[in-house]
Amino acid sequence: MKQKMMARLLRTSFALLFLGLFGVLGAATISCRNEEGKAVDWFTFYKLPKRQNKESGETGLEYLYLDSTTRSWRKSEQLMNDTKSVLGRTLQQLYEAYASKSNNTAYLIYNDGVPKPVNYSRKYGHTKGLLLWNRVQGFWLIHSIPQFPPIPEEGYDYPPTGRRNGQSGICITFKYNQYEAIDSQLLVCNPNVYSCSIPATFHQELIHMPQLCTRASSSEIPGRLLTTLQSAQGQKFLHFAKSDSFLDDIFAAWMAQRLKTHLLTETWQRKRQELPSNCSLPYHVYNIKAIKLSRHSYFSSYQDHAKWCISQKGTKNRWTCIGDLNRSPHQAFRSGGFICTQNWQIYQAFQGLVLYYESCK
């Protein structure tokens, strides 16, 4: 009888150990995903604008794609509104987490242009993104697409309003130990959170995100904050976050000087609302005016809602930054951020898109 009880206890212990290990290993799979649904350390995308040439057959849903396992841009065979697109595959993890109602998984979705908006509010940062994580790891998606994504209850879709202009974004997989730093960066960016779930198990380490989730933040917000982050596979990133009290152009006044490099910037340029190229400080900032896709194909920055910058070709420090803010006077009054890397693949990919840029007058 005693032996049977011991055997039963051992079987139970092994079963619990297996389930525990399975839970941890299963939890570790939250990550950026490629179009095959496989985990990748990071990816970046460039959604192409819908151009007026009807003969091209372009829908405004085509995109370029690059990840940690590839060397250069490739044009995806998927469309951005497809669940098999890189965003569809990655966000599938959000819908699974939402359906499971797990207390071990958290998410936070934010956008200054929320889906189905009633009134646009300038109270919050000009910043768009999504985080999904557990106590092992997760991902941070930073993008420029207004009204994206829909709330989890509605599943994956891409907004019709996101077709006309170009859009950009980057997804990075992070271990959980990076989320405390991300938590502080988000406080400064002051995102407009429209869907979130952060169980109490995370509240001890992550102070600000639960407050942002409930819009109850009482923390003092610094004017700006810079932090170093490391992806799950060791890729280094710098994240610049500015609040609405830092009343200056984030590119010229801070990023170029801190990175010690001349920057070529691609942001949404509305006529008579853009800042001119700036050579008044030691490190200069130039506006990109056109993006080339091939020898015979290009589009104007006026058709581009993407937000990125790179070091000028031939300079020592080769940086690429992707983020939230435009080079326009009113954006000095908005909070937001950029994540930057010296990854050579990413730099080469974006550098190859520059057709020409505006010199200083």
From Swiss-Prot:
Tell me which positions the record assigns to the signal sequence.
1-27
- Organism, per UniProt? Homo sapiens (Human)
**Catalysed reactions, semicolon-separated:** Endonucleolytic cleavage to nucleoside 3'-phosphates and 3'-phosphooligonucleotide end-products
Family label: Belongs to the DNase II family.
Q: Does the keyword Repressor apply?
A: no
Tissue range of expression?
A: Highly expressed in the eye lens and in salivary gland. Detected at lower levels in lung, prostate and lymph node. Isoform 2 is lung specific.
Query: Example GO biological process term?
Result: apoptotic DNA fragmentation
| E.C. no | 3.1.22.1
What is the protein's given name?
Deoxyribonuclease-2-beta
Q: Which residues are glycosylated?
A: N81, N103, N119, N278
> Which top EC class is given?
hydrolase
Read off the PANTHER family from this record.
DEOXYRIBONUCLEASE II, DEOXYRIBONUCLEASE-2-BETA
Top-level taxonomic group: Eukaryota
Query: Is Methyltransferase given among the entry's keywords?
Result: no
Give any GO molecular function from the UniProt entry: deoxyribonuclease II activity
Q: Which CDD domains match?
A: PLDc_DNaseII_beta_1, PLDc_DNaseII_beta_2
Q: Which UniProt keywords apply?
A: Endonuclease, Glycoprotein, Hydrolase, Lysosome, Nuclease, Signal
User: What InterPro entries does this protein's entry cite?
Assistant: DNase_II (IPR004947)
Recorded GO CC terms: extracellular region; lysosome
Subcellular location as annotated? Lysosome
Function comment: Hydrolyzes DNA under acidic conditions. Does not require divalent cations for activity. Participates in the degradation of nuclear DNA during lens cell differentiation.
